């Protein structure tokens, strides 16, 4: 199973927020997922990001590949840097 860390769109029309989830790469964007890692709300000023670092590191260590946007959010939270330290 090829797992991906990606954003799942939620919220009302024209006012989205996103949940950061781990899902099989074959599932649809807003479909079934394995585990929720956090959320991202771009509508607030500044944008709200909350990610469970321990869960994210566990999934990265087990081989989950983040999407481009998810990778950007993980880098801003410092999780990708911590993952790189752990891997060395």
From Swiss-Prot:
The keyword Ribosomal protein is annotated on this UniProt entry: yes
Single GO MF descriptor: structural constituent of ribosome
Protein name according to UniProt: Small ribosomal subunit protein bS16
Keyword terms of this UniProt record: Ribonucleoprotein, Ribosomal protein
Name of the encoding gene: rpsP
Stretches that traverse the bilayer: none
Covalent S-S links between cysteines: none
GO CC, any one term: small ribosomal subunit
Biological process according to GO: translation
Coiled coil: none
UniProt cross-references to Pfam families, sorted A to Z: Ribosomal_S16
Family: Belongs to the bacterial ribosomal protein bS16 family.
Domain of life: Bacteria
């Amino acid at each position: 199973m090829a797992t991906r860390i990606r954003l799942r769109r939620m919220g009302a029309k024209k006012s989205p927020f996103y949940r950061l989830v781990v899902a099989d790469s074959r599932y649809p964007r807003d479909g079934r997922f394995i585990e929720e890692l956090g959320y991202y709300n771009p509508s607030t000023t500044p944008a709200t990001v909350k990610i469970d670092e321990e869960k994210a590191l566990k999934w990265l260590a087990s081989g989950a590949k983040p999407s481009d946007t998810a990778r950007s959010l993980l880098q801003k939270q410092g999780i990708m840097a911590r993952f790189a330290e752990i891997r060395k």
